[in-house]
Amino acid sequence: MIASFEAPLATGFRVNTMLRDEDETIADLRAEGVPLEPVEGLPGAYSVPPDGRAALLASRPYADGHVYVQNVSSQLAPIALAPRKGDRVLDLCAAPGSKTGQLSALVGPEGEVTAVEKVRPRFYKLKANVYAQGATNVLPWMGNGAAYWRREPEAFDRVLVDAPCSTEGRFRTHDPETTAYWSGRKIREMKSKQVKLLWAGIQSLKPGGTLVYSTCTFAPEENESVVAKALRTFGDAIEVIDAGLPTSGPIADRAMAGLTEWRDRPLDPALERTRRVLPDELLEGFFIARLLKNSSTVGVGGGGMA
């Protein structure tokens, strides 16, 4: 895994099907000589090698907004969430809007995505991004994601909590900025936010609905530990289900089961169904947990997870 920090990273992208047909866009890219390859097991995902990035960014489909550059790992969470056409989806940590746009395309014009961001500059970046993608079914909301559940408790079919994190999965040795802000204190700070966001996400989810919790870090404190706390808080009202990732291809090859023990302490065995995606030339490091809500959680947890 350490060697992956030194490897040049392929450029992942998806076709913006809200603006143009996927097959037509891919045909145009190939005609312009863009050396793209589909990502096996992940519908709509493509990649170009490092030396093909310039050709992709110089292409007409990219200039027209028909191509959206997004690392393949970043595309996993919306795919795992698997929203249906017409679903109401809550994207609780939405900026800059990459996954928001992807979710918008998945639910279709009959669906709706509420996109939450509390930092003002990031909120306006989110709005501009989803507008550029043609995502007319997105409702941006500026405010604290940890408090949004009070506006619409148990109102959403699907909830994505792509939580802020210490970004260990994006470390690259040739780019000092990727490690500049990392510290043990940062991990503790992020965990505190993540616990509140996951609790709020669960409270926003309808009984019978699905929630995906994801990060781009390796720290168990920010991944399995956060999900374990939710399992202790909500008991049988929620359960960890299969992560919903591809079962073949490069993603399956790099996905490992979540930890069920950390620092000689056992964790909930159900965490084995979460997935850690290890980085390589195609993928950034990523963690995904998919939760099913079995029953109402109104009044559970006393306003947070202790």
Regions found by a protein language model. Name each.
Residues 1-306:
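S-adenosylmethionine
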